[in-house]
Design a protein with these regions (language model features):
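Glycine-rich, aromatic-flanked loop segments that form ligand/cofactor-binding clefts
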Residues: 70-73, 78-110, 116, 242-255, ...
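Aromatic-lined carbohydrate-binding/catalytic grooves of carbohydrate-active enzymes
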Residues: 323-460, 473
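Polysaccharide-binding surfaces and accessory modules of carbohydrate-active proteins
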Residues: 5, 10-13, 31-261, 277-279, ...
Length: 730
């Protein structure tokens, strides 16, 4: 069994195939963290709770409450009672006093996993996952706290979430609720996070823990370009293949915090959840509040094992789309080809040329609705602009279908332009503070998705367009963050609920969309990758990775993203050069190889690109058809990092049964008088013999991984090559 409880020792035990997680109860009913790490096979003990140690004096510990709580490895710490480290739960009573102390009441172990109401969350059958629900309670507040742990044994993952139930008569204010805490002794941990900006999202950052608190967070109403809801603690010297890694990833698309605190006793408390800044929730008598989920994994074989655990987990237990295990169509998006300057004839010209190159879908981006010829108007007015889309949307879609392409369309449903019919009719639908001039970003406001009538309007606006024509793909965009937090719908006490209610509104809209249109391929986007998070994956199998499509910039963006997300989730396109973001010119072949490590598509005007580039597209589309299953389903191995060596990049994708391995090598910069470069590959069966496709060269898997492989023959910068190794069957 993945979950066990030792009644005599009062120890909970959670086992995955490679890890064990232990919790124990004190005589007073406090739930403490004992261990998380390599799989244990013998009986567990609770001595790591240090229940008899005095934290301040060398005398016998009299269990003085304040000193005990400030050093005890609390499984779910609460605020206001003497634990002065970061708490996970702060509750204020009706009299305005803040304090909460929870004790164990009971627990339940069952096969399967319950859905989280209104939230994206992992799922699994009764054979795939086992869940432990621990019921704790503050008897004074009459507040129940349900700590849920779901063990996905095969994927080496434990998920955690928290639910609050107000069983009393008074109204409570939740001022902070985090979803997970990991309280451990320090092992000279370093903190690994993902940081960035618009057009350079999710770059890897790593550094030693210092005393005090270190965190990543967002207060923008989205997971953001700048920080990512992911934290890993790693031991010094951790590489792709060795070292301890503790990963925590938040399944949420709004404000978050991930924080590690190194304290006076050299213990580390790592917490993750909804950011407490500008958060508050009124919990009335009889009401419940469900916090989002955190996905945890432990690896003792470096970052590579963590990566593959997350990849398998998200593929098997987070993404619901029918496209999860099916080939995605090769699309061409007209944004960088035309921006707002297009009409029916131009789109059909692109479609005809795209079809001749082997492309399978045309996506019409921003500018098809209202009077939208720039970004200064019409968001919210989701009516087709027949001056541009001559003959109407159905005519355009039908004509594209006749050419032999499928059709997709762009929306930004959460936004409203001040210069729009919708805003003139309903200014109160925009998030803003009455009497204060609201801040515009990209000349737009954000709709108040806490209002049911707004949700209904937005949904029907999108759904009616999809019902009107044969549209099989939607790109759902969000191009600004939230500010001026005010809702004319919510009362004064509820204003701090707006950030979270907004995110719940987004989830409700996308849930309705994928329910009515189950065959729809939905791709989320937010100014590129500002809302690339597990919450969005629950609704869309792919997310636009970044607005930066430059092949070299994408190396670090896709390296960081692929550390936790499957390659099939990363929207990646071949675009024109000079690149529209950085002005760099790279070979068309390299752009294709980098985009192959994602969803693979095109973002250019295929009617205008150089003929030598256009001639390469049919070969690139054949390349995608050949390798799409391997890229989508295979095991990912990071071989070398351009971020670290500043010269080259390399990764490998191995079939689950090791029958084939695809290696991508990107030669970023040349150096004079250089030998061939030896790279140590991964992902092979050490006992098998492989042939390098296109040659007669044969290698054992053991040689490729231990002795290495020589790459050579590169002249000039920004070049790349694929190496396809196939297992010899005789």
């Amino acid at each position: 069994m993945a979950v066990q409880f030792n009644e005599d020792k009062k120890i909970f035990r959670l086992d995955t195939k490679k890890s064990t997680y232990l919790m124990g109860l004190t005589p007073e009913g406090y739930l403490g963290h004992i261990y998380y790490g390599d799989r244990l096979y013998k009986a567990a003990e609770n001595y790591m709770l240090r229940m008899e140690e005095p934290p301040y004096t060398p005398s016998v510990n009299k269990r003085e409450k304040s000193s005990f709580l400030d050093s005890f490895p609390m499984e779910y710490p609460t605020g206001g009672i003497g634990d002065y480290r970061e708490s996970c739960l702060n509750v204020r009573n009706e009299a305005g006093q803040m304090g909460c102390e929870i004790h164990y009441v009971s627990h339940e172990i069952y096969n399967g996993k319950k859905a989280l109401k209104g939230l994206p969350a992992s799922f699994g059958t009764e054979e795939e996952v086992q869940t432990l629900d621990i019921l704790c309670e503050d008897e004074i507040l009459r507040l129940q706290v349900v700590l849920s742990y779901s063990v996905f044994e095969k994927e080496n993952v434990i998920t955690r979430s928290v639910k609050l139930i107000n069983k009393g008569d008074q109204k409570l204010k939740i001022e902070k609720i985090y979803s997970a805490c990991l309280d451990m002794d320090n092992e000279n941990f370093e903190m690994l996070t993902l940081h960035g900006s618009w057009a350079r999202e999710r770059h890897i950052q790593q550094g030693p823990l210092r005393y005090g608190k270190q965190m990543v967070s967002s207060t923008k109403g989205e997971s953001s370009h700048q920080e990512h809801p992911f934290v890993a603690l790693v031991t010094p010297g951790t590489t792709q293949q060795q070292g301890k890694v503790y990963g925590m990833h938040f399944v949420y698309s709004g404000n978050f915090i991930g924080q590690a605190e190194l304290n006076q006793f050299d213990s580390v408390r790592t917490v993750m959840g909804i950011n407490k800044e500008e958060f508050g929730w009124i919990l009335k008598a009889g009401e419940e509040f469900q916090a989002p989920e955190v996905v945890m994994t432990y690896s003792h074989e470096g970052l590579g094992e963590m990566t593959r655990s997350y990849h398998d987990f998200y593929r098997n237990h987070m993404i619901r789309s029918k496209y999860l295990h099916n080939k995605r169509p090769i699309l061409i998006n007209n944004w960088e080809a035309t921006y707002f300057d297009f009409n029916t004839d131009k789109l059909l010209d692109i479609a005809r040329e795209a079809k001749s190159c082997g492309i399978e879908m045309l996506v019409m981006d921003d500018g098809w609705f209202g009077v939208r010829n720039s970004d200064n108007c019409s968001l919210g007015d989701w009516k087709v602009n027949t001056d541009k889309i001559i003959g109407g949307l159905k005519y355009l879609v039908d004509e594209v279908n006749k050419i032999g392409l499928e059709f997709g369309i762009w929306f930004e449903p959460e936004m409203i332009s001040p210069n729009s019919d919708l805003y003139r009719a309903h200014p109160e639908w925009a998030i803003q503070i009455p009497g204060r001039e609201a801040t515009q970003s990209r000349q737009q406001y954000v709709l108040d998705l806490s209002r049911s009538e707004v949700l209904d309007y937005v949904y029907e606006s999108v759904a009616s367009i999809l019902r009107s024509a044969n549209i099989v793909y939607v790109k759902w965009d969000m191009n600004r963050q939230l500010s001026d937090l005010g809702s004319t719908y919510l009362g004064a006490e509820e204003q701090q609920e707006l950030f979270h209610r907004y995110v719940l509104g987004v989830y409700a809209l996308q849930e309705r969309l994928v329910t009515e249109f189950p065959d729809l391929l939905l791709e989320n986007c937010s100014g590129g990758g500002a809302r690339f998070d597990p919450g969005m994956l629950y609704y869309s199998p792919q997310i636009w990775c970044s607005d930066d499509t430059d092949a070299i910039e994408r190396l670090m963006i896709q390296e960081g993203t692929s550390m936790i997300y499957p390659l099939s989730t990363m929207g990646a396109h071949v675009s024109d050069c000079p690149n529209h973001t950085v002005g760099r010119v790279t070979p068309f072949e390299t752009r294709g190889h980098v985009a192959l490590a994602g969803t693979f598509g095109y973002e250019l005007d295929v009617t205008k690109i150089p003929e030598e580039d256009r001639k390469m597209i049919p070969e690139q589309t054949k390349m995608y058809h050949k390798y799409h299953e391997l890229v989508r389903e295979g095991d990912y191995y990071r071989i070398a990092s351009y971020r670290e060596n500043h010269l080259y990049d390399c990764w490998a994708i191995a079939a689950k049964d090791k029958r084939e391995v695809l290696v991508t090598y990107v030669h970023v910069f040349s150096t004079p008088n250089a030998h061939s470069r030896r790279i140590f590959l991964q992902g092979f069966d050490p006992e098998a013999v492989y042939v390098l496709e296109g040659t007669e060269e044969k290698y054992t898997g053991e040689m490729l991984m231990k002795c290495g492989f020589l790459v050579k023959g590169f002249w000039g910068d920004f070049k790349s090559k694929l190496y396809h190794f196939v297992k010899v069957t005789e």
